[in-house]
């Protein structure tokens, strides 16, 4: 696939000095401007770096105007951008300026070489499944959203009691601090710290991971991604729903949360020498 219109999206993680990120984005823009590409700069990024000679576009419109998006930031930036671009389906390249870089996997030290490889067609396409979440209250949908990483139902200060069913089959009632429904992508995020398994991103599977369960026999389980997961609130004092750790929605005792595999996917492009297991080994400090 040939890419002509390239969108540049930047984010400023707290760990990165503003002038360092400015320089990184400006260098990337200057590098690409020497080639035969039409550049589009996400409008907040443009205001930050003060380069005005290129088209500025709101994030929500980039998918309709660009062929590909290059994101300079961390995994959180990738998550937010992915949800914004999901309807248009344009692929993404992630340059890591955050902490981990499970999604934004290109190293900023050699980003020009890696980006040029991808833009010249020397890449592997990594399609990631999304999950769709709907909150029902009195049998009406009151909230819905896509997630690339996970959906988390979490209590406030006290335990929450949840009833979990899969494909209309009762699984269990659990008392815990909450529950995580994770995509394979999300299994290296919150679900991993809660004791869940790592699922390869090409698996068509989801994981259900309890958070600090009261009964130690409540263990994480992995299920087919085409399953429908229904979670009912049995008892709570306060609780909320979190989408990718970025969107928070307050829950009520009457609510039922339904999680299913979304029909849409997102695509991350990697250079040909990318290896998922090498990435895990480096990020998780395996031997």
Where are the model-predicted features located?
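ATP/NTP phosphate-donor binding region
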Residues: 1-68, 80, 109-126, 135-144
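Redox-cofactor binding/interface segments in oxidoreductases and associated redox assembly factors
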Residues: 8, 71, 181
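Short glycine-rich anion-binding loops that position phosphate/pyrophosphate groups of nucleotides
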Residues: 13-14, 75-77, 98-100, 185-187
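N-terminal glycine-rich "phosphate-gripper" loop used for MgATP/nucleotide binding
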Residues: 71-75, 82-84
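Short, acidic/small-residue loops that bind anionic groups at enzyme active sites
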Residues: 88-106
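Catalytic core of DAGKc-family lipid kinases
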Residues: 100-177
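ATP/nucleoside-binding phosphotransfer catalytic cores, i.e., glycine-rich phosphate-binding loops
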Residues: 153, 166-170, 216-287
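Gly/Ser/Thr-rich active-site loops/lids in small-molecule metabolic enzymes
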Residues: 172-217
């Amino acid at each position: 696939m040939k890419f002509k219109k390239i969108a540049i999206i930047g984010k400023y993680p707290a760990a990165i000095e503003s002038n360092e990120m400015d320089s990184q984005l400006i260098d990337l823009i200057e590098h690409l401007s020497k080639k035969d590409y039409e550049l589009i700069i996400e409008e907040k990024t443009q205001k930050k770096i003060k380069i005005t000679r290129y088209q500025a576009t709101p994030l929500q419109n980039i998918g309709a105007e660009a062929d590909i998006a290059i994101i300079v930031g961390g995994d959180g930036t990738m998550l937010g951008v992915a949800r914004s671009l999901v309807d248009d389906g344009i692929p993404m390249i992630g340059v890591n300026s955050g902490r981990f870089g499970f999604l934004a996997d290109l190293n900023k030290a050699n980003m020009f070489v890696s980006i040029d490889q991808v833009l010249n067609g020397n890449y592997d396409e990594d399609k990631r499944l999304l999950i769709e979440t709907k909150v029902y209250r009195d049998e009406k949908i009151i909230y819905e959203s896509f997630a690339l990483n996970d959906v988390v139902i979490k209590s406030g200060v006290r335990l929450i009691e949840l009833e979990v069913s899969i494909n209309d089959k009762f699984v269990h009632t659990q008392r815990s601090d909450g529950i995580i429904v994770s995509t394979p992508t999300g299994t290296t995020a919150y679900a991993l710290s809660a004791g869940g398994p790592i699922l390869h991103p090409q698996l068509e599977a989801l994981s259900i991971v309890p958070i600090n369960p009261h009964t130690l026999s409540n263990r994480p389980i992995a299920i087919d991604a085409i399953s429908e997961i229904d979670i009912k609130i049995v008892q709570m004092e306060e609780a909320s729903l979190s989408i990718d750790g970025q969107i928070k929605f307050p829950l009520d005792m009457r609510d039922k949360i339904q999680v299913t595999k979304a029909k849409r996917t997102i695509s991350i492009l990697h250079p040909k020498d990318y290896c998922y297991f090498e990435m895990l080994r480096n990020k998780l400090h395996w031997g």
